[in-house]
Amino acid sequence: MEFGLSWVFLVAILKGVQCEVQLVESGGGLVQPGRSLRLSCTASGFTFGDYAMSWVRQAPGKGLEWVGFIRSKAYGGTTEYAASVKGRFTISRDDSKSIAYLQMNSLKTEDTAVYYCTR
């Protein structure tokens, strides 16, 4: 009985820690094809500069698609992109503000999606 209570307590602690991490996206909207849009991801609850940050998206009726990521400054702050967005999308970060950005240029109709940032 004592072991069971300890295990439940540990789960409660871990869930509480997880809930402290917040990633809030902003900047979305409707734009015409060919135009630009910049999304922001404001992070809290962890040391932002220590982590790589990724962007993924989900088009209507489809699964999640990886867009790209930016490494932490400790790993050069370099970026990688999906072939579908390479040359049009740029990911950047401002560690002093705990914000990751997704600059989207030359937008296409197929870029229509809900965009999420992930740690």
Swiss-Prot record:
Which GO MF terms does the UniProt record name? antigen binding
Show the disulfide pairing: 41-117
Where do the segments described as Complementarity-determining-1 lie? 45-52
Sequence segments annotated as region (Complementarity-determining-3): 118-119
Ranges for domain Ig-like: 20-119
The annotated region (Framework-3) lies at 80-117
Q: Where is this region: Framework-2?
A: 53-69
Q: Which UniProt keywords apply?
A: Adaptive immunity, Cell membrane, Disulfide bond, Immunity, Immunoglobulin, Immunoglobulin domain, Membrane, Secreted, Signal
A Pfam match: V-set
What range does the record give for the signal peptide? 1-19
Q: How does it assemble?
A: Immunoglobulins are composed of two identical heavy chains and two identical light chains; disulfide-linked.
Q: What does this protein do?
A: V region of the variable domain of immunoglobulin heavy chains that participates in the antigen recognition. Immunoglobulins, also known as antibodies, are membrane-bound or secreted glycoproteins produced by B lymphocytes. In the recognition phase of humoral immunity, the membrane-bound immunoglobulins serve as receptors which, upon binding of a specific antigen, trigger the clonal expansion and differentiation of B lymphocytes into immunoglobulins-secreting plasma cells.
What is the protein's given name? Immunoglobulin heavy variable 3-49
> Source species, please?
Homo sapiens (Human)
Gene from which this protein is expressed: IGHV3-49
